[in-house]
Amino acid sequence: MKNLLLICLLVSLVSCQGNAQKAKETKTYAVQKSDAEWKAELPEMAYYVLRKAGTERAFSGPLNDNKKTGTYVCAGCQAPLYQSEYKYDSGSGWPSFDRGIDDNLEYDVDYKIGYPRTELKCNKCGGHLGHAFNDGPRETTGMRHCINSAALNFIPADETP
């Protein structure tokens, strides 16, 4: 009876580990700075979003309503992330895109709110951008990249090098 109880306990412990977030390998990014350097260089909200994986309030970011033609780049390292033709109004309160410039995006999984979500990061500096959801426009990719304005800078098409 003791052995059966012990086996049941071990099985339940192993089962609980199934949903636990596993330790991740440390990735080396092309752009590396100390936390102090990021904090000194970035505006407060950009630092909070990019470096601490925060989220700005819905409808508070200036790029949510931007309709200009151009490129959205990482506010931390200026890597091109999104083209304006892929931006659409999702009604979520954050800039939304149906796709990005894949070579510059990193897809990760986070469990910060208790269930898995696809986190989007800049592949050059590791900055947190937002999350990807599969509730985007069906006529294109079906994806919604829900991105914090504070994580982006916008470069108008007529200023692109």
Residue ranges with predicted function:
Residues Q17-E37:
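Sec-dependent signal peptide cleavage junction
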Residues L13-S15:
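C-terminal motif of bacterial Sec signal peptides marking the signal peptidase cleavage site
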Residues Y29-A30, K39-V73, A79-P161:
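A short Gly-Trp-Pro
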